[in-house]
């Protein structure tokens, strides 16, 4: 039997064919990301970040303010629709922003009206304002749930950013 016998040639062809088939399977079977696809993914992430950007839409969720400020018992239909349409990753951030704007405006208005008031009257107002702020934060945290938003999060972790948010205050 020589080196190029028919059985050796067939065996070599089988191994070569198997190798080519495996190479093609791995080459086309494993997903790869080329520069164009990677750039498209990056643009999608940037677009999502921009969609959460508070500067893009400063009046976002303004229809929910009356509910948070206790001028309404339930959020308006428009408020709930806006929340429902909003992307889940932006929802709590938008609620926090709207609450912060509302509280900072109220704090500014309070500071103007309290300048000439007696000290103990200003303290009572601050205590009352602190309770109102607590209620607004609670309403804000559960706003997605109150509106029956289907996608999570249905509760937001709301942070305090107001000058009235002192812990262990001496105003009692």
Swiss-Prot record:
InterPro entries: Bifun_inhib/LTP/seed_sf, Bifunc_inhib/LTP/seed_store, Napin/2SS/CON. It comes from the Eukaryota. Residues 1-35 form the signal peptide. Keywords: Seed storage protein, Signal, Storage protein. SMART domains: AAI (SM00499). Disulfide bonds: none annotated. Gene3D superfamilies: Plant lipid-transfer and hydrophobic proteins. One of its GO terms (molecular function) is nutrient reservoir activity. Residues 151-160 have a biased composition (Basic and acidic residues). Residues 108-172 are annotated as: Disordered. Belongs to the 2S seed storage albumins family. This is 2S seed storage-like protein. It comes from Picea glauca.
């Amino acid at each position: 039997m020589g080196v190029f016998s028919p059985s050796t040639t067939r065996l070599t062809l089988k191994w070569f064919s198997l190798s080519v088939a495996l190479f093609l399977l791995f080459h086309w079977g494993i997903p790869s990301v080329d520069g164009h696809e990677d750039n498209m993914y990056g643009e999608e992430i940037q677009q999502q970040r921009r969609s959460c950007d508070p500067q893009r839409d400063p009046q976002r969720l303004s229809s929910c303010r009356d509910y948070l400020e206790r001028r309404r018992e339930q959020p308006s239909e428009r408020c709930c629709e806006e929340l429902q349409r909003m992307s889940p990753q932006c929802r709590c951030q938008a609620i926090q922003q709207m609450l912060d704007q509302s509280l900072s405006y109220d704090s500014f208005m309070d500071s103007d009206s309290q300048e000439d008031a007696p000290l103990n009257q200003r303290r009572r107002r601050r205590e009352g304002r602190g309770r109102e702020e607590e209620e607004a934060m609670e309403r804000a945290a559960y706003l997605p749930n109150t509106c029956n938003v289907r996608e999570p999060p249905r509760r937001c972790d709301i942070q305090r950013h107001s000058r009235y948010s002192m812990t262990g205050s001496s105003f009692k």
